[in-house]
Amino acid sequence: MTNRVLVIASGNAGKIREFSNLLQELPLQVNPQPDGIQVEETGITFRDNALLKARAVAEATGHWALADDSGLSVDALGGAPGVYSARYANSDPERIERLLKELGDRTDRQARFSAALCIAAPDGSVLAAVEGYCEGSITFSARGTQGFGYDPVFEVKNSGLTFAEMTQDHKKQHGHRGRAFALLKPELEKLLENDPGQDAGATPIP
């Protein structure tokens, strides 16, 4: 029996690499999202947007789809950028520049990354949905060359390192996606045990 196909519902190369690394131990054929799929992120929470993306990509491809919606919430900015993290500016450097400019020289720089993960089937049913968090703070300047997005300016609590200064294994252990995936993995393993190689629906999760 061939391994089940799981499509990563993202066009972000950094996310695809990170999820491929997280999923490498499971009996899955991990595929990137095909070109041309656009999903409007109209949800008001990270979970809402993850559900929208997973359902849309699963329906479009005919395979299970794993989506995440993640973002950075900064206390001193009232939780911004939040669900608008990816739309805060046009590119990663511009998003970081805007964030640092808005924080200025404030000393209250507490922040957290959130990640909602969702797996959906082609019929629109939700097979699993979890959320993970990582506490930290915003640095005064970018540090490190690994990662993507806000990684260079987010220092993980009690680590002394930004995400961009961590190895993939270190980030897997401490990062919000890694923590969310730790919750998702046993659910995904159970799904694969019960239905390893054919697409099927499931009882929807509200």
UniProtKB/Swiss-Prot annotation:
GO biological process: nucleotide metabolic process; purine nucleoside triphosphate catabolic process
Keyword Lyase: no
Gene Ontology CC annotation, any one: cytosol
A Pfam family recorded for this sequence: Ham1p_like
GO molecular function: dITP diphosphatase activity; ITP diphosphatase activity; metal ion binding; nucleotide binding; ribonucleoside triphosphate phosphatase activity; XTP diphosphatase activity
Cofactor binding note from Swiss-Prot or TrEMBL: Binds 1 Mg(2+) ion per subunit.
EC number(s) recorded for this UniProt protein: 3.6.1.66
Cross-referenced HAMAP family: Non_canon_purine_NTPase
Quaternary structure, from the entry: Homodimer.
Designated name of the protein: dITP/XTP pyrophosphatase
Species assigned in the record: Synechococcus sp. (strain CC9311)
